[in-house]
């Protein structure tokens, strides 16, 4: 568990004096960091008793072709680019906005694999 609330320190190094302590709504978790590989998912209990599917490894993506309106399940071959972090390409991490190479061609991921549990992508022209 990770606390994601505001720091108790000011930019000057002094302390903020708050009227409340840490709240349960401010906790978070470590990122799932979805890789290319044999499918592995983890179900996580979230706030309010709901569930979130975390994709740890995925090998298929649902790719849509905007020109023809066709959508197909295709195999992910490689991660070609990722504007979030250049190291994500080396580590083959799947994140929203990453450019992947599929059997249909190059595509941009539009879903959040570590939050949704699936990779949805749109084919690049």
From Swiss-Prot:
GO process annotations (BP): translation
Key word Ribonucleoprotein present: yes
Molecular-function GO terms, alphabetical: structural constituent of ribosome
Keywords on record: Ribonucleoprotein, Ribosomal protein
Pfam families according to UniProt: Ribosomal_S8e (PF01201)
GO cellular component: ribonucleoprotein complex; ribosome
Chain positions covered by the region annotation Disordered: 1-35
Source species, domain of life: Archaea
InterPro entries linked to this entry: Ribosomal_eS8, Ribosomal_protein_eS8_arc, Ribosomal_Se8/biogenesis_NSA2
Family: Belongs to the eukaryotic ribosomal protein eS8 family.
Subunit structure: Part of the 30S ribosomal subunit.
Name this polypeptide is given: Small ribosomal subunit protein eS8
Naturally occurring in which organism (per UniProt): Methanoculleus marisnigri (strain ATCC 35101 / DSM 1498 / JR1)
Gene, per the UniProt record: rps8e
């Amino acid at each position: 568990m990770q606390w994601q609330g505001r720091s108790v320190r000011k930019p000057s190094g002094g302390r903020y004096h708050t009227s409340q302590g840490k709240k349960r709504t401010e906790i978070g978790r470590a990122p799932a960091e979805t890789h290319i590989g044999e499918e592995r998912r983890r179900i996580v209990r979230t706030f309010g008793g709901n569930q979130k599917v975390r994709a740890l490894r995925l090998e298929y993506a649902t790719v849509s072709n905007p020109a023809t309106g066709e959508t197909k399940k295709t195999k992910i071959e490689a991660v070609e680019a990722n504007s979030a972090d250049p190291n994500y390409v080396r580590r083959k991490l799947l994140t929203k906005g990453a450019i992947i190479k599929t059997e249909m061609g190059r595509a941009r991921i539009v879903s959040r694999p570590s939050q949704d549990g699936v990779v949805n992508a749109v084919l690049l022209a």
